[in-house]
Swiss-Prot record:
Biological processes per GO annotation: amino acid import across plasma membrane; amino acid transport; creatine transmembrane transport; gamma-aminobutyric acid import; monocarboxylic acid transport; neurotransmitter transport; nitrogen compound transport; sodium ion transmembrane transport
Free-text activity regulation comment from the record: Taurine transport is inhibited by hypotaurine, beta-alanine and nipecotic acid.
Gene Ontology molecular-function annotations: amino acid binding; amino acid transmembrane transporter activity; amino acid:sodium symporter activity; creatine transmembrane transporter activity; gamma-aminobutyric acid transmembrane transporter activity; gamma-aminobutyric acid:sodium:chloride symporter activity; monocarboxylic acid transmembrane transporter activity; taurine transmembrane transporter activity
Upper taxonomic lineage: Eukaryota, Metazoa, Chordata, Craniata, Vertebrata
This protein's name: Sodium- and chloride-dependent GABA transporter 2
Topological domain spans for side Extracellular: 142-206
Cellular component aspect of the GO annotation: basolateral plasma membrane; cell projection; plasma membrane
Regions of this protein lying in the Cytoplasmic compartment: 1-40, 549-602
Function per UniProt: Mediates sodium- and chloride-dependent transport of gamma-aminobutyric acid (GABA). Mediates transport of taurine and is the major taurine transporter in hepatocytes. Can also mediate transport of beta-alanine and hypotaurine.
Top-rank taxon, per record: Eukaryota
Family (UniProt): Belongs to the sodium:neurotransmitter symporter (SNF) (TC 2.A.22) family. SLC6A13 subfamily.
Modified residues (Phosphothreonine): 587
Length: 602
């Protein structure tokens, strides 16, 4: 390859142009990268937060929890928890210029455990979330055929109980207690070859292993050059799913029965608001869909320029995320309404959530459409892209945290690429257990416990307490004003102080009280050691916060008061805005806000 650089001509003279090279610090480490432009940041965050949950979880929760009435608790959680915590994490990354662990070390060392907790959650998420991509790739490849393999009962994996419901005359009672559909048999007997329990893992499903390997290879090359590659990839992965969603929406609303499905999706049932479970579902959906408490927003925000208007970006992204969930509901329930009418069954019998929607309900609907392979390809390609950018941003979050913890080790030429490769290979091999014949039971354990709403709520409580009551809400607002040039809406500050921790704590306690052991398909009950393993996965993140605080208090020398003072003071190298003296008389509220900084004189 010719590495010579052409020159420029000025007044007849040729001047050499230096090649663009990575900047190197005095200690030999590479300078920390930044986004090339704002659009790369916006699309990266959009790709992370707009994922599978918008398509397969939010619409079902609306239907299940009172239709349009569900928007009341959802919007309350959005404005008291979703936007405030989303903004807090993004602004924290931009202000400290650090990843998900060292950002917390910078502003409050005693709560560095928040960073470890979020990275533990994201590490577990990296292992199991990508398995969904492996399933989606398998379905995508299976869709390149004239007759979809889940459309009939004539394959070797089908049983004598298989009934093609979509071709059955509804007036005839051909179903039996053991009847099943070709879609379910394709999912359970062809894709998963599912065993009878977690105690029987069986052999690896090698076709899925190859799909998982392909997913990890794609993920690796999306982020291997840091934000330089990530920022370019998201132009496609974050925008193309919208095109697919619009196509599926137009097709869905033009089908017979679509209006019935949309009515079930939106018809308000106000009485459901008296059920605490509805409020818990709204809260956990906000945390799931906004990627809160995973360290991802902090990592992405850390690559912003210091004076980027992150407040405006965050509000716009939150509204975009919720709007996408709302629109996706029309696309999904118009199809479910069509299925309900075609099969002559109530919509409750075809409505699914989670993997059941993506790999059972929607494939069943696609079979009934003209040119079904085309619509199957569109849908599963959308699923792959929705999951892909969420996946590689989560990996980026973990890698950013590790690089910022050990910059002299990893912030050198090719070291980062090697680190990403190690993370990918280790996660790939751990994830293989979920591609065995009993792997679905392991996947459900990870999904139910490892990255559950309970874990995210626990971390969110300490995030708001740390920033608002230890570091100081007013101090952080001053830092934000220094970055963006003005102070955000005051309600966000009071959410950090009061509403967010209170709402998160109440929802967390309710989730503990209402806890029910995990089951699969409402039939299979996990053995006691399965639930014990699940709780270990959940506690592996939550224990990080108190454990780190105790560890730091015990290892520091000196009187307890002095140790506490050291552990609550922010790093001296953080940008600080000069504080003008207060000339107005103190009010109870201003006195309270000054107390939030613990009078540490930091």
């Amino acid at each position: 390859m010719d590495n010579r650089v052409s020159g420029t001509t000025s007044n007849g003279e040729t001047k050499p142009v230096c090649p663009v090279m990575e900047k190197v610090e005095e200690d030999g480490t590479l300078e920390r990268e930044q986004w090339t432009n704002k659009m790369e940041f916006v699309l990266s965050v959009a790709g992370e937060i707009i994922g599978l949950g918008n398509v397969w979880r939010f619409p079902y929760l609306c239907y299940k929890n009172g239709g349009g009435a569900f928007f009341i608790p959802y919007l309350i959680f959005l404005f008291t928890c979703g936007i405030p915590v989303f903004f807090l994490e993004t602004a924290l990354g931009q202000y400290t210029n650090q990843g998900g662990i060292t950002a917390w070390r910078k502003i409050c060392p005693i709560f560095e455990g928040i960073g470890y907790a979020s990275q533990m959650i994201v590490s577990l998420l990296n292992v199991y979330y990508i398995v969904v991509l492996a399933w989606a790739l398998f379905y995508l490849f299976s869709s390149f055929t004239t007759d979809l393999p889940w459309g009939s009962c004539s394959h070797e994996w089908n049983t004598e109980n298989c009934v093609e419901f979509q071709k059955t005359n509804n007036s005839l009672n051909v179903t039996s207690e053991n009847a099943t559909s070709p879609v379910i048999e394709f999912w359970e007997r062809r894709v998963l070859k599912i065993s009878d329990g977690i105690q029987h893992l069986g052999s690896l499903r090698w076709e899925l292993v190859l799909c998982l390997l392909l997913a990890w290879i794609i993920c690796y090359f999306c982020i291997w050059k840091g934000v330089k590659s990530t920022g370019k990839v998201v132009y496609f992965t974050a925008t193309f799913p919208y095109l697919m969603l619009v196509v599926l929406l137009i097709r869905g609303v033009t089908l017979p029965g679509a209006a019935q499905g949309i009515q079930f999706y939106l018809y308000p049932n106000i009485t459901r608001l008296w059920d605490p479970q509805v409020w818990m579902d709204a809260g956990t959906q906000i945390f799931f869909s906004f990627a809160i408490c995973l360290g991802c927003l902090t990592a992405l925000g850390s690559y912003n320029k210091y004076h980027n208007n992150c407040y405006r970006d965050c509000v716009a992204l939150c509204i975009l995320n919720s709007s996408t969930s709302f629109v996706a509901g029309f696309a999904i329930f118009s199809i479910l309404g069509f299925m309900s009418q075609e099969q002559g069954v109530p919509i409750s019998e075809v409505a699914e959530s989670g993997p059941g929607l993506a790999f059972i309900a929607y494939p069943r609907a696609v079979v009934m459409l003209p040119f079904s392979p085309l619509w199957a390809c569109c849908f599963f390609f959308m699923v792959v892209l929705l999951g892909l950018d969420s996946q590689f941003v989560c990996v980026e979050s973990l890698v950013t945290a590790l690089v910022d913890m050990y910059p002299r080790v990893f912030r050198k030429k090719n070291r980062r690429e090697i680190l990403i490769l190690i993370v990918s290979v280790v996660s790939f091999f751990i994830g293989l257990i979920m591609l065995t014949e009993g792997g679905m039971y392991v996947f459900q354990l990870f999904d139910y416990y490892a990255a559950s709403g309970m874990c995210l709520l626990f971390v969110a409580i300490f995030e708001s307490l740390c920033v608002a009551w230890v570091y100081g809400a007013s101090r952080f607002y001053d830092n934000i004003e220094d970055m963006i040039g003005y102070k955000p809406w005051p309600l966000i500050k009071y959410c950090w102080l009061f509403f967010t921790p209170a709402v998160c704590l109440a929802t967390f306690l309710f989730s503990l009280i209402k806890y029910t052991p995990l089951t699969y398909n409402k039939k299979y009950t996990y053995p006691w050691w399965g639930d014990a393993l699940g709780w270990l996965l959940a506690l592996s993140s939550m224990v990080c916060i108190p454990a780190w605080s105790i560890y730091k208090l015990r290892t520091l020398k000196g009187p307890l008061r002095e140790r506490l003072r050291q552990l609550v003071c922010p790093a001296e190298d953080l940008p600080q805005k000069s504080q003008p003296e207060l000339t107005s008389p103190a009010t109870p509220m201003t006195s309270l806000l000054r107390l939030t900084e613990l009078e540490s004189n930091c």
